[in-house]
């Protein structure tokens, strides 16, 4: 069986991606006229009022059909001829002085899964040639707001700007072997970074030191970019879902004691593919009684939900199951009172688990194709980023959590109808837990699933690493 590194020595499968997108276009928009797919890379841009370049992030639609991370590049896929052409920036003598020689066409041919590499100055001439070859009957597919003013589609019968984006988004949901290898690599690097962050917490005095340890480890192992801004939240900060300050002291100024625990939601990006991992660990080597109790519930939520995963499973059913496990656990602790079914019907668990169970993962952290319904009136499903059945080959996060956020819980406790279901006396002991979320990245297979995340999560492992 080929290893991850063996797979990644090959070329990114841009040509097969182009064919897949073309098939989706033809399936939904007819097999009639010949067509071309036209995509542009992200442009080089300067920071406003500055001569420094903005941090570069390649357009994901362009990358999916090229595997190319060069800015100011272009791509044309002639669907009928099955010819994929990449256009890269030509040599600029003045730029060479500052940045060195750019990638040559010959070098690009060796790197990328394309049929031809030309200079970016040849884009319009190539479009005219293709349009002429098809006698003016060809259709050009491009993405609105991602076409330069200088692009010329002369000789084409029509330019469609509203269908290509949707086709690529749909194609990206199902990953091939190469993409799974990239996601696995990103996860492996991030697992090392999570362990490094836990170890750094032993001597750290501020959240930013732990964030620094995570990022440094990612860079050292080849993941120079982060999938998203890391979340490093100590104590009650963990109750904020997308906490981003990462600058709080690990010692409580009132008690002069180290805070209970830290939630880290962070993932490195490897060759444009993301990881998204969340772990919670104790400061000082041992979870408090209350944090351990909540951790056990959340871990049970995650393990049971992962066990349900296989091709064609209904994601809403998995999400609902997570809520039922949460209700059962919070009932056992005395935080909730009532019957499991009544608490579920009243959506009381949403006060503690307000977000969706997970989202697709790929080149974007919240990857394409999830079809969310943020207008859903049902609070349990409103923020569920994926709706429907999970296809074989998709990769999804499973990230249940329980949070103690007054802003969310107080409206429930103060409600004449819902307040009776929450025991505020017992609840008082759990506010300083903040939040517990455990997140892994799961590859959906025909008969089951594969967990791409190797970072430790058992209570004993987390305490041992933090000791």
From Swiss-Prot:
Its EC number is 3.4.11.9. Mn(2+) 1 binds at residues 276, 399, 439. Binds 2 manganese ions per subunit. Mn(2+) 2 binds at residues 265, 276, 439. GO terms for biological process: proteolysis. Keywords: Aminopeptidase, Hydrolase, Manganese, Metal-binding, Metalloprotease, Protease. Its cofactor is Mn(2+). Catalyzes the removal of a penultimate prolyl residue from the N-termini of peptides. Belongs to the peptidase M24B family. This is Probable Xaa-Pro aminopeptidase pepP.
């Amino acid at each position: 069986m080929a290893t991850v590194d063996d797979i990644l020595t090959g070329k990114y499968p841009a040509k097969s991606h182009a064919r897949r997108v073309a098939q989706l276009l033809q399936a939904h928009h007819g097999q009639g006229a010949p067509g071309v797919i036209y995509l542009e890379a992200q442009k080089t841009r300067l920071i406003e009022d500055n001569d420094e370049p903005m941090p570069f992030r390649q357009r994901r639609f362009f990358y999916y059909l090229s595997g190319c991370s060069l800015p100011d590049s272009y791509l044309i896929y002639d669907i009928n001829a099955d010819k994929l052409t990449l256009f890269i920036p030509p040599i600029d003598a003045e730029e060479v002085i500052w940045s060195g020689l750019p990638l040559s066409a010959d070098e690009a041919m060796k790197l990328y899964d394309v049929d031809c590499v030309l200079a970016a100055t040849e884009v319009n001439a190539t479009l005219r040639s293709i349009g002429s070859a098809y006698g003016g009957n060809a259709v050009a597919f491009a993405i609105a707001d991602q076409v330069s003013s200088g692009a010329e589609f002369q000789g084409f019968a029509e330019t469609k700007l509203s269908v290509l984006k949707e086709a690529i988004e749909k194609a990206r949901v199902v990953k091939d072997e190469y993409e799974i290898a990239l996601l696995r690599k990103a996860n492996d690097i991030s697992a090392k970074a999570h362990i490094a962050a836990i170890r750094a917490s032993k001597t750290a005095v501020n959240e930013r030191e732990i964030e620094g340890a995570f990022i440094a480890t990612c860079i050292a192992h080849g993941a120079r970019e982060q999938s998203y801004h890391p979340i490093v939240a100590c104590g009650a900060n963990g109750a904020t879902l997308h906490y981003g300050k990462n600058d709080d002291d690990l010692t409580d100024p009132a008690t002069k004691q180290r805070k209970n625990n830290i939630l880290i939601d962070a993932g490195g990006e490897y060759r444009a593919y993301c990881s998204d991992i969340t772990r919670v660990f104790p400061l000082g080597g041992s979870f408090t009684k209350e944090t351990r109790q909540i951790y056990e519930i959340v871990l049970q939520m995650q393990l049971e939900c992962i066990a349900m995963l296989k091709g064609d499973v209904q994601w809403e059913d998995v999400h609902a199951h997570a809520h039922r496990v949460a209700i059962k656990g919070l009932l056992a602790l005395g935080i909730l009172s009532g019957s499991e079914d009544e608490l579920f019907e009243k959506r009381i668990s949403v006060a503690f688990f307000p977000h969706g169970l997970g989202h697709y993962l790929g080149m974007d952290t919240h990857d394409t194709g999830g079809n969310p319904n943020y207008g859903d009136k049902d609070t349990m499903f409103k923020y569920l980023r994926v709706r429907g059945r999970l296809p074989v080959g998709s990769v999804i996060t499973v990230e249940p959590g329980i949070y103690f956020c007054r802003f969310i819980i107080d409206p429930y406790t103060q409600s004449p109808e819902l307040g009776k279901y929450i025991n505020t006396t017992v609840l008082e002991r759990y506010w300083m837990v903040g939040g517990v979320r455990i997140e892994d990245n799961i590859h959906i297979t025909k008969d089951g699933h594969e967990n791409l995340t190797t970072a430790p999560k058992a209570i004993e492992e987390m305490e041992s690493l933090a000791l």
